[in-house]
Amino acid sequence: MNIASQIEDMGRRARAAGRRLAAASPAAKAGALDHLATLLEQRQDAILAANAADLAAAAEAGMDAPRMDRLRLTPATIAEMAAACRHVAALPDPVGAIETQWQRPNGLLVGKMRIPLGVIAMIYESRPNVTIDSAILCLKAGNAVILRGGSEAIHSNLALAALITEALSSVGLPAEAVQVVSTTDRAVIAELCKLEEHIDVIIPRGGETLIRAVVDMARMPVLKHYKGVCHAYIDRGADLAQAVEIIHNAKVQRPGVCNALEGLLVHRDEAAAFLPAIAERLGNDGVEFRACPASLPLLGDSAIPMKDEDNGQEFHDLILLVRIVDDMDEALAHIAAYGSNHTEIICTRDHGNAMRFLREADASMVAVNASSRFNDGGQLGLGAEIGISTSKLHSYGPMGVQELTTTKFVVFGAGQIRQ
């Protein structure tokens, strides 16, 4: 069977499984998720062995450190995946819930009911944990899903897929509700993008090149998980000691992820006190500063002059753009010009400035006095996420169970006819 026929067959089976899954009981879906959590814990050694094969191949191919970090699984990350399964299992099931109702003058009762999106195709790179997060969220929301992970994670993804199939079968749900593409041929992506008859929405999660390619090819709606060019603005009068720790966490904890900080904008009145403290705190961790002319002498030996192309750059590394700005207007203008609608934060003591920043910074999450690293489904209480949408339609920000459903109108009558 050639790739086009294989992918069309997967789409057809996903559509059939999706119809069954949409009608599945909340207990069956929760049971599958709980069983998957147990399987992850019981089969940890096999998962780590599969991941070790991926890591060895990646190292031989010269993969850079940030991508290796995203590829790597550990006992701790497997425990986190199991915990996410149980958390999502315990969430309220949105499918079939009537969220709001109103009565018309003619007596009709009108409501909006939550329903699955249908069949989702997920295209992603590097991170094997996305296989689990995507599967459990789609399952909970009643969606069938076709998962196409990166070739660098093929052994890990297939090992996880086997557990998902076992968990689904254990409660009588169709195994085809979650399918992982087993070939690493990149032609799969183009074939998935053609299947508008069987796939309702496609979600690319990865580098800019991947996302642009999917947007260009897809015949169905695309929910984009675009790059994370995240900024922090240090306002005049901010708590500088607190801000140093926020910036350190946002940049250093995991520099290769999409909610890591990439740009630091500092009010001119705070630069002399704040930037040397930042240089000391982050410089000890090996951070390189790409600094504007005014900030360069305040950052010491860890700083080099910024270039124009550093603006709007997602470094995925221990590199931080630093600019001194005159006021919030200039900070917001910079964010509007170079941000990616992902995450923006402000450190401030001024309530009015905080509220203005929340209103005017255009991003899927805007935070006051908190790290950009909190733009994450688990951290925001969603249990897990299938991605962080930087598109405003149909969802904006981390996409949990609720965001993987839509609504339809339901009408209750007593014989009314239209006059």
UniProtKB/Swiss-Prot annotation:
Instruction: Provide the top EC class.
Output: oxidoreductase
GO annotation, cellular component aspect: cytoplasm
Q: What is this protein called?
A: Gamma-glutamyl phosphate reductase
Which reactions is this enzyme annotated as catalysing?
L-glutamate 5-semialdehyde + phosphate + NADP(+) = L-glutamyl 5-phosphate + NADPH + H(+)
Question: Which EC numbers characterise this protein's activity in its record?
Answer: 1.2.1.41
Glycosyltransferase listed as a keyword: no
Pathway involvement? Amino-acid biosynthesis; L-proline biosynthesis; L-glutamate 5-semialdehyde from L-glutamate: step 2/2
The UniProt entry's sequence similarity note says: Belongs to the gamma-glutamyl phosphate reductase family.
Q: Where in the cell is it found?
A: Cytoplasm
Provide the GO MF annotations for this entry.
glutamate-5-semialdehyde dehydrogenase activity; NADP binding
BP terms from Gene Ontology: L-proline biosynthetic process
Q: What is the lineage of its organism?
A: Bacteria, Pseudomonadati, Thermodesulfobacteriota, Desulfovibrionia, Desulfovibrionales
**Pfam families in the record, alphabetically?**
Aldedh (PF00171)
Q: What is its main location?
A: cytoplasm
Q: What InterPro entries is this protein classified in?
A: Ald_DH/histidinol_DH, Ald_DH_C, Ald_DH_N, Aldehyde_DH_dom, G-glutamylP_reductase_CS, Glu-5-SA_DH, GPR_dom
What keywords does the record list, in alphabetical order?
Answer: Amino-acid biosynthesis, Cytoplasm, NADP, Oxidoreductase, Proline biosynthesis
- Give the function comment from the record: Catalyzes the NADPH-dependent reduction of L-glutamate 5-phosphate into L-glutamate 5-semialdehyde and phosphate. The product spontaneously undergoes cyclization to form 1-pyrroline-5-carboxylate.
Q: Does the keyword Nucleotide-binding apply?
A: no
Q: Which SUPFAM superfamilies match?
A: ALDH-like
